[in-house]
């Protein structure tokens, strides 16, 4: 029976080490080149409304900075989930105004 453990050492390697695609840092795009979508949703949240900002092409540090700024601007809590910023409550209009002021191409989507 074959071992389920991967080999501890590389036997053959051609063209040098291969970069892990998950470890690459995402490059921040300028706000003018980003198409950001803002929507309010309640699905899967026990009836609580959250505003989801998606389409951001920022690094992890950039997303954290934007999250902190949006939470402060809206006066509510929020989190990062799956490259989307979630802000508690229906804050679509406030977030749209803030992002447009920062230079993002933002649009409200959904109901």
From Swiss-Prot:
Record's keyword annotation contains Cell inner membrane: no
UniProt keyword annotation of Protein biosynthesis present: yes
Keyword tags: Protein biosynthesis, Translation regulation
GO annotation terms (biological process): formation of translation preinitiation complex; regulation of translation; translation reinitiation
Gene3D superfamilies assigned: SUI1-like domain
InterPro entries, sorted: DENR/SUI1_TIF, SUI1, SUI1_arc_bac, SUI1_dom_sf
Family: Belongs to the SUI1 family.
UniProt name for this protein: Uncharacterized protein sll0546
One MF annotation (Gene Ontology) recorded for this entry: translation initiation factor activity
Superkingdom, taxonomy of origin: Bacteria
């Amino acid at each position: 029976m074959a071992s389920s453990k991967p080999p501890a050492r590389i036997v053959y390697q051609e063209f040098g080490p291969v970069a892990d695609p998950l470890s690459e840092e995402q490059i921040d795009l300028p706000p003018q080149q980003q198409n950001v979508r803002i929507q309010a949703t309640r699905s899967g949240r026990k009836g609580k409304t959250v505003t989801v900002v998606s389409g951001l092409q920022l690094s992890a540090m950039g997303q954290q900075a934007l999250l902190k700024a949006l939470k402060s601007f809206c006066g509510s809590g929020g989190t990062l989930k799956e490259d989307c910023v979630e802000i508690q409550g229906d804050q679509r209009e406030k977030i749209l105004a803030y992002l447009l002021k920062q230079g993002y191409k933002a649009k409200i989507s959904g109901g």
